[in-house]
Amino acid sequence: MSETPDGVEVRPFEPGDAAAFWELKRGFELGIGEGTGGDDKLSKYEAKLTDDYRERYLSWVERCATDDPGCVVVAEAVSGDGHGDGGIDSDGGDGDDDGDARLVGYAFALPEEMTFIWDAAVLNELFLDADYRGTGVADELMAAVLDHARSQDLPLDRIVLDVDEANDRARAFYDRYGFDHWGELVARDL
């Protein structure tokens, strides 16, 4: 658990975070669709965000967090002024109505048992509410992921991730951390 300069605590995911976590996950998915691929890609990402997908995804997140504590971390902002501070509150609301804690981001490294997928640690997702970008919170999330990855028993001492080449902001962030192009991920429809 760490405290960022902006008063945002980075801590392990807890089951009570599920509703707020899901709203951030939606932001992640819709941002991929909207920001990196046009209307067709956005439509595909919107269409997959069904209630069934939500339940399956959150069940998987909880299993991963239980099996490998610390592989899923959240950034939680607390506002004591009663004015809210953006982000997503624990019931999935917009977080602007009171001074309670709000989830403003998350990072998800795959559990150690899944590291054989790439023979390395895998950063599955890192997402931050737009209001908190550029504040240092993403750096705290990345630090937590890297610390966790270093604790895993890995075939190769490396961490990999998938980032869309059109996502300039994310690519610049990962470049700052020394991520280099390593192979090429290709895909096709089933």
What does each model-identified segment do?
Residues 72-74, 100-111, 122, 127:
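Conserved beta-strand in the GNAT
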Residues 121, 151-162:
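Conserved GNAT acetyl-CoA-binding A-motif
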Residues 132, 136-144:
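Conserved acetyl-CoA pyrophosphate-binding loop and the N-cap/start of the following alpha-helix
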Residues 129-131, 135, 165-166:
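Active-site acidic-Proline motif in GNAT/NAT acetyltransferases
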Residues 9-11, 15, 26-60:
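Conserved GNAT-fold acetyl-CoA-binding loop/helix
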Residues 139, 165-183:
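Conserved active-site alpha-helix within GNAT-family acetyltransferase domains
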Residues 52-74, 78:
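A short helix-loop-beta-strand connector motif used in the catalytic cores of GNAT acetyltransferases and
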